[in-house]
Amino acid sequence: IEISTGKIIGFLNSDDYYTSAYVLEHVAQIFETENVDAVYADLIYVDEINTARVVRYWKSKKVELLNFSCGFIPPHPTLFLRREVYGRVGNFNPNYRFSGDFEFMLRVFEIHKVHSFYLDETIIKMRTGGATGGNLVSIKDQNIEILRAFKENKVEVVKYLYFTCKAINRIKQRLRAFLCML
């Protein structure tokens, strides 16, 4: 982040890709016309070998207060922020091995209430796998870190409600993926 040179910062994982050559142009246009500090969108998980096979469809929505406490989080690879947001919010916390993206976005949206725009379209194809990609131990570790993030950032959460909503969201994502493949 410190060595980046642009006014808008986004991350693209090494194995992932934009759904079109115009994604960055479209995102830049939104920053210009909507006067916001953050833009995020939808994401689809694709099979790591057969990228035509959709595994999960992460449909986002407008961020509202308490979304995070109810199991919602925007897909982190779709998030673009103005550089100055990092000055207000801080960088990613390296003490979060599995859920640094969650903890960071918790600060962005719940603590600092950064003015954002939800782009209602899929802009990223993300290959399955990764550090939290399905291994039960890493999922458990991620969930422990998420609870720690709520506590350290003083955001109240009802554990059982959070995990129930998160599970329902995952089921909906897989159902959307199944319907996309029909």
Model-derived segments and spans:
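Nucleotide-sugar donor-binding/catalytic module of glycosyltransferases
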Residues: I1-S138
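Generic alpha-helical structural signal
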Residues: E25-A28, N143-L147, C165
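Short, charged low-complexity intrinsically disordered segments located at boundaries
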Residues: W58, G134-K140, Q173-L182
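A broad, low-amplitude sensor of folded, mature protein cores
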Residues: S60, F104, M126, I146, ...
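Short, conserved alpha-helical segments within structured domains
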Residues: P77, G100, Q142, Y160-A167
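Catalytic core of nucleotide-sugar-dependent glycosyltransferases
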Residues: E121, G134-Y160
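Membrane-proximal basic amphipathic "stem/tether" segments
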Residues: K151-L182
